[in-house]
Amino acid sequence: MNNKPTVLAVDDSPIVQQLLKNALADYYRLLVTGDAMSALSLLFQEPIAVLVLDVMMPDMDGLELCRTIRNLPQFKTLPIVMVTSKDAAFDKIQGQMAGATEYLTKPFEPEQLRQTIHRVVGSPLAEPV
């Protein structure tokens, strides 16, 4: 049985998806999708411990997805870590206003991402497999 917390990562870039897998798959149960609608579907189907979210995506961007999730009572306390190339101070404020728990900028250090997720999930990092 897998006792690792489940991380849902949402990014439309296949390259970033692979970077997220490389950084997280040994430590967490990782689900990856490239769009907001798939992410919403997975939120209702899986026990997600933390959402890792890009801002710039087609159709519904990460800020809108974050606001949508925060308006759903069952996800008001879900930790949301934005990982994005938008690095201006105003961008970070927009992320906070949308409901992000943490805001990291790309390129990210894998260890920084793991530690951020560990901090918001509140459970010890699983040993790498």
Question: How would you label these PLM feature ranges?
Answer:
Residues 108-117:
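C-terminal output helix
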Residues 57:
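Receiver (REC) domain active-site loop signature in two-component systems and cognate sites
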Residues 14-32:
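Two-component/phosphorelay signaling modules centered on CheY-like receiver
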Residues 3-14, 20-21, 51-52:
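Conserved acidic segment of CheY-like receiver
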Residues 32-50:
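Acidic, metal-coordinating helix/loop segments flanking the phosphotransfer/catalytic sites
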